[in-house]
C-alpha cells in the first residue's frame, strides 16, 4: 500500500509544471510555423506573468475568507482545465486570426494562458493538499514535481527537430498574356521530426490526465491528520520545498501544522544571523537571478540559438529544461550556503547569460556561426546558465526559509518582481523596437 501511494504522489506532482515546461521545449518546432516567429518566446514570458493572477486569487481567498476555499475542488478545477487546454492545443495550436492586418496566434496564446494559469496555481494548491498526508510522501511528490521538467525535456530529445534544407523554388508569373521570365528563389524547408507537435501536446494532455487521476485516488484515501512531527516537512525536504520556485509572494498556508510547530520551536532553534548588507545582497541576487532566468534570457533564446541552426536551439531548450531539476537534485545532496560561493556561482551563471544575450544581439550573424564549436558553445552556455542560476535560486531560498517566514514571503515577492521586470523590459525591445534581428538559414549572408 505505501508504494502504491508513493506512485500516486509522484504522478500527482508530475502535473505541476509539465505543461509550461513542455511548451518551452517544443518552441524550436513551433517558431518555424507560427507567424510571430522568433519573437514568440517574448510573448510567452509576458503571458506566464499574467497567469500569476491564479495564485494571487488563491492567496486573497485564504487571506480574506479563511477556511472557505476548498483546495481539493480548486485542484480538480485547475487540472481539468489543464487537460482540456492541452487537448485543444493539440488541435488548434497553429490556428491564426488576423488582428490589425497581421496574422496572430490567438488560439495558441489563449490556451497558453490557461496552461500557465494551471501551473502557477498548482504552486499554492498542490502542496497544502500534500500536507494532509504523512511527511514521507511529500518527498515523493517533490520527485514528481522535478520530473515535470525532466520528462518533457527527455521526450523532446526523443522527438528530435526538423532538420532544415535549402531548396530552389521557381516562381512563374500568373499573367497569361505576358508571363515574363521565371524567377528562382531559395527557400528554407524543414523536414518533419520523429513525431509531430500534435502528438507532443497530446502527450502533455496524457501527463496532466495521469496527474488528475492520481489526485482523484489520493483524495479518496482514508487518512488521519495529527499535529505531530510526522506530518511536517522534514529538514531533508527544505531544498525540495524551495525548489518549487517560491511562486507565491504571500504564503496562503496559514495556521498549518508546520507553522505551529515552527512557532513552538523558534525559541529552541537559533535562527541564522545575517547583517543588513548580507540580506540586501541576498534579495538583490534573488531579484536578478529570477529576472534573468524567467524574463530577460528566455525572451531572446530564439535569437541566441536559431542562427546556429534548429538542432542547436532544440538541444539548448531541451537540455536546459533537464538542467533545472538536475540542479535542484544537486542542491538537495550538496547544499552550500556560503554567500561568497553563491555569489561566485551567480556571477559565473550571469557570465554565461551575458554570452547568450550577446549572441542574441548579434543575430542573425553571431560568433562562430556554421561551426561545430559555435554550436557546442551556445548549447553548453544555455545549459550552464540555467543550471548554475537554478542552484543559486534554490540555496538562497533555503537560507531565507531557515531565517523566518516573513523572509520567505519577501523572497517570493522578489521572485515575482524580478520575473515581471525581466518580461516587461524585454517585450518592447523585441516586439516594438526590434533590437534583435531574425534571419533565414538559406538567405542570410553574414560577413566572414
Curated annotation (Swiss-Prot):
Its main location: membrane. Keywords: Cell membrane, Glycoprotein, Membrane, Transmembrane, Transmembrane helix, Transport. It catalyses: riboflavin(in) = riboflavin(out). GO terms for biological process: riboflavin transport. One of its GO terms (cellular component) is plasma membrane. Belongs to the riboflavin transporter family. This is Solute carrier family 52, riboflavin transporter, member 3-A. It comes from Danio rerio (Zebrafish). The lineage of its organism: Eukaryota, Metazoa, Chordata, Craniata, Vertebrata.
Amino acid at each position: 500500500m505505501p508504494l502504491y501511494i508513493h506512485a500516486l504522489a509522484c504522478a500527482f506532482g508530475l502535473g505541476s509544471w509539465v505543461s509550461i515546461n513542455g511548451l518551452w521545449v517544443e518552441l524550436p518546432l513551433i517558431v518555424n510555423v507560427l507567424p510571430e516567429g522568433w519573437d514568440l518566446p517574448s510573448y510567452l514570458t509576458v503571458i506566464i506573468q499574467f497567469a500569476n493572477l491564479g495564485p494571487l486569487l488563491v492567496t486573497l481567498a485564504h487571506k480574506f475568507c479563511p477556511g472557505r476555499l476548498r483546495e481539493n475542488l480548486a485542484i480538480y478545477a485547475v487540472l481539468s482545465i489543464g487537460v482540456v487546454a492541452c487537448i485543444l492545443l493539440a488541435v488548434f495550436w497553429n490556428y491564426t486570426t488576423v488582428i490589425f492586418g497581421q496574422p496572430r496566434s490567438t488560439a495558441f496564446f489563449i490556451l497558453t494562458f490557461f496552461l500557465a494559469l494551471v501551473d502557477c496555481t498548482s504552486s499554492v494548491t498542490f502542496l497544502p493538499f500534500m500536507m494532509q498526508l504523512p511527511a514521507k510522501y511529500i518527498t515523493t511528490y517533490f520527485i514528481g514535481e522535478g520530473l515535470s521538467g525532466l520528462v518533457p525535456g527527455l521526450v523532446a530529445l526523443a522527438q528530435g527537430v526538423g532538420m532544415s534544407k535549402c531548396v530552389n523554388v521557381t516562381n512563374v508569373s500568373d499573367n497569361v498574356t505576358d508571363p515574363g521570365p521565371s524567377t528562382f528563389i531559395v527557400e528554407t524547408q524543414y523536414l518533419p521530426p520523429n513525431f509531430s507537435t500534435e502528438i507532443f501536446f497530446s502527450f502533455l494532455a496524457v501527463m496532466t490526465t495521469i496527474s488528475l487521476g492520481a489526485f482523484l485516488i489520493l483524495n479518496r484515501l482514508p487518512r488521519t491528520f495529527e499535529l505531530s512531527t510526522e506530518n511536517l516537512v522534514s529538514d531533508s525536504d527544505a531544498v525540495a520545498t524551495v525548489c518549487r520556485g517560491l511562486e507565491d509572494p504571500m504564503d496562503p498556508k496559514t495556521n498549518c501544522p508546520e507553522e505551529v510547530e515552527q512557532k513552538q520551536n523558534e525559541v529552541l532553534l537559533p535562527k541564522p544571523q545575517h547583517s543588513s548588507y548580507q540580506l540586501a545582497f541576498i534579495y538583490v541576487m534573488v531579484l536578478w537571478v529570477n529576472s534573468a532566468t524567467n524574463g530577460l534570457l528566455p525572451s531572446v533564446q530564439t535569437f541566441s540559438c536559431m542562427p546556429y541552426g534548429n538542432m542547436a536551439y532544440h538541444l539548448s531548450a531541451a537540455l536546459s529544461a533537464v538542467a533545472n531539476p538536475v540542479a535542484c537534485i544537486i542542491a538537495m545532496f550538496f547544499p552550500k550556503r556560503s554567500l561568497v560561493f553563491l555569489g561566485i556561482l551567480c556571477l559565473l551563471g550571469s557570465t554565461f547569460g551575458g554570452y547568450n544575450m550577446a549572441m542574441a544581439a548579434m543575430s542573425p550573424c553571431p560568433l562562430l556561426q556554421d561551426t561545430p564549436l559555435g554550436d557546442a558553445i551556445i548549447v553548453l552556455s544555455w545549459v550552464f546558465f540555467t543550471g548554475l542560476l537554478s542552484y543559486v535560486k534554490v540555496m538562497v531560498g533555503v537560507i531565507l526559509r531557515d531565517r523566518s517566514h516573513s523572509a520567505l514571503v519577501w523572497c517570493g515577492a522578489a521572485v515575482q518582481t524580478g520575473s515581471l521586470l525581466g518580461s516587461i523590459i524585454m517585450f518592447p525591445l523585441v516586439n516594438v523596437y526590434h533590437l534583435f534581428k531574425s534571419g533565414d538559414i538559406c538567405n542570410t549572408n553574414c560577413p566572414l
